[in-house]
C-alpha cells in the first residue's frame, strides 16, 4: 500500500523513491510488526483473560506443566495481525507470491483457531479431530501446491494460465522448466526433475508437514517461536537472492521473478515473532496456540517451495524435523511392541523430544535455549549452502 502511494507521488517528492528498495521496506516491515505486537500484546492478553481463553493442559504430560493451566492461549492471533498489517503496508500488493503465502498463512491460522476454540470451549486438550484438521490442511496445501507448480515456472499470472492449460491439453503429463526442479544443496548443477505431479506432491508434503512440525514443537515457553524467527529470516535472505537475476546467476540458484518481495513477509514474521516472544518467554503470559503454530509452519513451508529450497528448509528446521520424528517413532514403536508382545513400550520417556529431556531432569529454560542454539547452528549451515557448491 505504501509502495503504491510512494510511487504515485515520487516525482513530486523525490525522497519517496527509497520505497522502491526492497531492503528498506523489509526493515520497516520488521519494525512495524514488532511495534504492533508490543503495543497490542497487553491488550490481547487482557482480552483473552476476560474471555477465559485458558490453555487446557494434558494431565499425562510433565507434572511441572500443570501450573500452566489457565494461561491464555490463541495468542497466535496477535502474530497474524502483526504480520498481516505489516505485510500489507510495506509489500507490493500486485505480487502473486506474497498473496499465496498470506492465503496459506491465514488459512492454516483459521484451522488452528477452530482447533483452539474447541479446546477452550470444551476443555479438551485434543481439540479438533485429527482427521478433520488434516482434511482442511490438505485442502489448503493442495491449493497452494497446484498454484505454485505453475506460478514458480511462469513470470506472470497470464503465463501461469497458459502453462496450466498446456498441462491439461497434454493429458497431465507435461514437464516443468528446470527452475521447478528439486535443488540439491552443495552442487551447482545437480537437481532432480519433479514433473507436475512430483512438484505438487513435494509441495503438499513440505507445507502440511512443516505446519504440523512447528505445532508439535510448540510445547514449551518460547520453544517454537524463536526457531521460526531464525528460519524465517534465513528464508527471507534466500527469497531476496532468488528474486535477483544477478545474485541468482552468481550463486547458481534458480531465479524466480517476484520472489524477492517475500523478504518483506519474512521481516514481518520476524518482527511479530520477536514481539510475541516478549510475552511468551518463560514464564509465559500467553501461548500462541494452534492458530499461530499451524500458520507459521505453513508460511515457512510455502516460502521454501517458492524459493526452491525445500532441502535447505529440512536442514535449517532440523529441530522441527527431529521433534516430529520423535513423535512418529514413539507411536510406531509403541504400536509395534504392543502388537508383538501385548505390552506397548516406549523409546523415549515422553514425546515430543523436548518432554523427554524434561523427564531426564533438564529445566524448561535449558531445553528451550539449547534448542535455540541448535537451530542457530543449523540455520548458519543452511546459509552456507549458498557458497559451498
Swiss-Prot record:
The keyword Translocase does not apply. Keywords: Cell cycle, Cell division, Cell inner membrane, Cell membrane, Cell shape, Cell wall biogenesis/degradation, Magnesium, Membrane, Metal-binding, Peptidoglycan synthesis, Transferase, Transmembrane, Transmembrane helix. It holds the Pfam family MraY_sig1. PROSITE patterns: MRAY_1, MRAY_2. The keyword DNA-binding does not apply. GO terms for molecular function: metal ion binding; phospho-N-acetylmuramoyl-pentapeptide-transferase activity; UDP-N-acetylmuramoyl-L-alanyl-D-glutamyl-meso-2,6-diaminopimelyl-D-alanyl-D-alanine:undecaprenyl-phosphate transferase activity. Pathway: Cell wall biogenesis; peptidoglycan biosynthesis. InterPro entries: Glycosyl_transferase_4, PNAcMuramoyl-5peptid_Trfase, PNAcMuramoyl-5peptid_Trfase_CS. It is an enzyme of class 2 (transferase). It is a multi-pass membrane protein. It is found in: Cell inner membrane. GO terms for biological process: cell division; cell wall organization; peptidoglycan biosynthetic process; regulation of cell shape. Its cofactor is Mg(2+). Its main location: membrane. CDD domains: GT_MraY. The chain crosses the membrane at residues 21-41, 70-90, 97-117, 134-154, 189-209, 222-242, 259-279, 286-306, 311-331, 366-386. It catalyses: UDP-N-acetyl-alpha-D-muramoyl-L-alanyl-gamma-D-glutamyl-meso-2,6-diaminopimeloyl-D-alanyl-D-alanine + di-trans,octa-cis-undecaprenyl phosphate = di-trans,octa-cis-undecaprenyl diphospho-N-acetyl-alpha-D-muramoyl-L-alanyl-D-glutamyl-meso-2,6-diaminopimeloyl-D-alanyl-D-alanine + UMP. Its EC number is 2.7.8.13. GO terms for cellular component: plasma membrane. Belongs to the glycosyltransferase 4 family. MraY subfamily. PANTHER family: PHOSPHO-N-ACETYLMURAMOYL-PENTAPEPTIDE-TRANSFERASE, PHOSPHO-N-ACETYLMURAMOYL-PENTAPEPTIDE-TRANSFERASE HOMOLOG. Catalyzes the initial step of the lipid cycle reactions in the biosynthesis of the cell wall peptidoglycan: transfers peptidoglycan precursor phospho-MurNAc-pentapeptide from UDP-MurNAc-pentapeptide onto the lipid carrier undecaprenyl phosphate, yielding undecaprenyl-pyrophosphoryl-MurNAc-pentapeptide, known as lipid I. This is Phospho-N-acetylmuramoyl-pentapeptide-transferase.
